[in-house]
Curated annotation (Swiss-Prot):
Chain positions found as N6-acetyllysine: K671, K980
Keyword Lipid biosynthesis: no
Gene name, Swiss-Prot/TrEMBL: UBA1
SMART domains tied to this protein: UBA_e1_C
Subunit structure: Monomer.
Catalytic reactions on record: ATP + ubiquitin + [E1 ubiquitin-activating enzyme]-L-cysteine = AMP + diphosphate + S-ubiquitinyl-[E1 ubiquitin-activating enzyme]-L-cysteine
Tissue expr: Ubiquitous.
Annotated GO MF terms: ATP binding; ubiquitin activating enzyme activity
Function: Catalyzes the first step in ubiquitin conjugation to mark cellular proteins for degradation through the ubiquitin-proteasome system. Activates ubiquitin by first adenylating its C-terminal glycine residue with ATP, and thereafter linking this residue to the side chain of a cysteine residue in E1, yielding a ubiquitin-E1 thioester and free AMP. Essential for the formation of radiation-induced foci, timely DNA repair and for response to replication stress. Promotes the recruitment of TP53BP1 and BRCA1 at DNA damage sites.
UniProt: ATP binding residues: A478, D504, R515, K528, D576, N577
Disulfide cross-links: none
Phosphoserine: modified positions: S4, S13, S21, S24, S46, S810, S816, S820, S835
UniProt-recorded name of the protein: Ubiquitin-like modifier-activating enzyme 1
Pfam families given in the database record: E1_4HB, E1_FCCH, E1_UFD, ThiF, UBA_E1_SCCH
Amino acid sequence: MSSSPLSKKRRVSGPDPKPGSNCSPAQSVLPQVPSAPTNGMAKNGSEADIDEGLYSRQLYVLGHEAMKRLQTSSVLVSGLRGLGVEIAKNIILGGVKAVTLHDQGTAQWADLSSQFYLREEDIGKNRAEVSQPRLAELNSYVPVTAYTGPLVEDFLSGFQVVVLTNSPLEDQLRVGEFCHSRGIKLVVADTRGLFGQLFCDFGEEMILTDSNGEQPLSTMVSMVTKDNPGVVTCLDEARHGFESGDFVSFSEVQGMTELNGNQPIEIKVLGPYTFSICDTSNFSDYIRGGIVSQVKVPKKISFKSLSASLAEPDFVMTDFAKFSRPAQLHIGFQALHKFCAQHSRPPRPRNEEDAAELVTLARAVNSKASSAVQQDSLDEDLIRNLAFVAAGDLAPINAFIGGLAAQEVMKACSGKFMPIMQWLYFDALECLPEDKESLTEDKCLPRQNRYDGQVAVFGSDLQEKLGRQKYFLVGAGAIGCELLKNFAMIGLGCGENGEIIVTDMDTIEKSNLNRQFLFRPWDVTKLKSDTAAAAVHQMNPHIRVTSHQNRVGPDTERIYDDDFFQTLDGVANALDNVDARMYMDRRCVYYRKPLLESGTLGTKGNVQVVIPFLTESYSSSQDPPEKSIPICTLKNFPNAIEHTLQWARDEFEGLFKQPAENVNQYLTDPKFVERTLRLAGTQPLEVLEAVQRSLVLQLPQSWADCVTWACHHWHTQYSNNIRQLLHNFPPDQLTSSGAPFWSGPKRCPHPLTFDVSNPLHLDYVMAAANLFAQTYGLAGSQDRAAVATLLQSVQVPEFTPKSGVKIHVSDQELQSANASVDDSRLEELKATLPSPDKLPGFKMYPIDFEKDDDSNFHMDFIVAASNLRAENYDIPPADRHKSKLIAGKIIPAIATTTAAVVGLVCLELYKVVQGHRHLDSYKNGFLNLALPFFGFSEPLAAPRHQYYNQEWTLWDRFEVQGLQPNGEEMTLKQFLDYFKTEHKLEITMLSQGVSMLYSFFMPAAKLKERLDQPMTEIVSRVSKRKLGRHVRALVLELCCNDESGEDVEVPYVRYTIR
């Protein structure tokens, strides 16, 4: 899953401002965003009171200001069954000020179905008191206390947010009225078997600072008309992305300068590149340029109290295929509360008498309901299903509703993201058996064991089947931890012959602790898979988890081989990159195993289920590739901070990693030069010049030499190169058409003058000199004063721009220039490189970029290098936090989204284990908790293809036994003849991986040689690799013609050799 990274948002405080649509000068309507600190090393551009090491990934979702507001909010969570503990876990990880756990009940067997911090020895103990020490471990910044008294008003008044879970309606109404009258924000959450309910009341005057959390859009202006209203046209490089009603501000407009620095202006979108603003008819004429930026304007939203909203509800849809269901469930849940009040228990599982009574109660509730709620026709089957499962308690439903509820708590605390207005209902009845008659009351009776809450919904047969499952979990990060927790709760792999195999090669880092909730501070540096397996064993001692530390890929196919996959019942991906996802998808298609796929990005998440012979696979559809930045934009014409940050990352690699690697290869590999000369274009020249610089021209002998190098490099990049660029293209340069060269996306730069008293200049030298020293194994220094003193004695050669230097304006120009290479310069370089014999024992130390260690100078270099270049081009700088997001390609993450997404994954798991065969039983899902938005759809069926009268999908293949009855292996000729006689197909090309084994245009001599060779011998010869003993079959790809000579698309071949 890919999307634009989210950025830090500004905080807006005070009353709700009223930005105008008139174009009058700004009157400080919105607070100004503080400029990025100039001294990245001194202040790191970070907030002193937020632990950025811990909250790093969450800060990219919420921003610093929302995070600060979160840290001033005390939250009460009432009810510590499975739903309550899920909400408490997520908000404690999120970092609120304090959490109080309230429960007057004791742990029962049924609670263990989903309450992951209760153990069998806790039966009979107070749920809040038992859970408190285990929840408190999650985040040392959040005090967690337990309270077992009544919810009296004096007690409630000490909280900013109150969360009620699994509570009687009578209590909800009483607490709701009190909270609404006192401005205390209220979240009510409830789960009943396969059903969930959520309600929010954040008061009558809540200030919403940012409704969607997306990075404010910004684009370049190409024209503004003098009109009423004025029409703005943007450069046609990309659509502006604005919506009508958005507010924007302008900067750098030439001519119509009245727009610059204006208060936010409301716009109306006219097209993908145009929108109208205010009356510009009296403004100056527009000349050129300008940047228009979206402004997040705070707005006031109002909530009804619980009692008022009960009578006049507003619903957030979770599934548009169930459009009428929220209103039906609104009646059903009220009837359920009446049933529980009358009987002091929920309806018995699958009990017809109780179901009939609930239907009667629902009719009564409906008949007395207000006109806004009353249903013309009550869905009595739905009400009966509610009765049948209401006694159940399912970990996946609690994970989903708990993730949503915890996100609502964070919205209540921070004013960030649009809250649920005000009711949300959810059901997953598709999880029930497709054979509706297979469940009976007897099968759903409690067994006095930890799975009673689940048996109440699905019966004992599924419980036994879950226990026998053998699943492969790939990844033990955020999604992996949540999956393991859910697996433990539902009993997956907990029975005889059951097993979960989890693999992850990573170790635990501090930034993981904020959302990978199975890990603790004392686990940092330990292996994720081992630690997660041990932690989940505490939650359910019956779970059988085997932990591995292997990366999945061709290199580990000897471990995850045919025998391994054939014993599996399914695979769950918990990966963070597309390549690994696609690899596992291919493996699952090949071995015909179900795959549960999911991913998150900030508040966004997605779930996909892949079922053999039924659905398409993960790789059947792909996101469009991310747009890359043109090389010439990076090298000479940046116009956004993203460009300067990517340039700084390239600088890091080109200064501190690649030259050191090339030098080490040159000194140890006699064929290095020969191999380098075979590279394309100007690469041989660039590589050998870098080796020469590292070993001859720039070889430092001391720390002072490193400081000198850093100072010279500063001048090269931020003064000399810019002066050369301006020599080639002066500020007043015109294009061949007479237009200014420096216009549109090309920003005219200016050279910088080195100033040792400028903290940013000294930051750069400190970081660059230390990293340069590190590559040579020299000791560095953190003494800024000493470095400043050294810099005063550095002699910087005078620079004069040269004539005849070619600077490429486009990537096409660059490519054509790179096609030729100066052979005489190459020969000269080869002659001047020192012989490896003369440098015995010398080696360099390449540096791998590590963004999360603030002491290693890596981010110090990136921030300084990027912001200096930004200053060259008058681009607003970025602080360390934003720089780390972009340069480090960080994926924003928050525990709430992960919990909700994994809840949905495990609902699909129920269906997979039961063997559902109807496509409409399964649900692919997408959610965005910030909006909030939920979208569910049936998976797409596997696309069908045909040759002759034979239909096939990606799940089909030709099965060919390579070993014949006489014990000899099939030759290429026999293979070709087999397809001609058995399938009436003439093979025109045959390949294995990237190796071409046969083609119709192959030279006659080579073809004659191969025809009588065994297939595996040809594969080994062409690929130059011996087949491992673990390889039992080869995947062969075919191009074929039918009998009429037409190309036909056919499946691949599984060619069995053992």
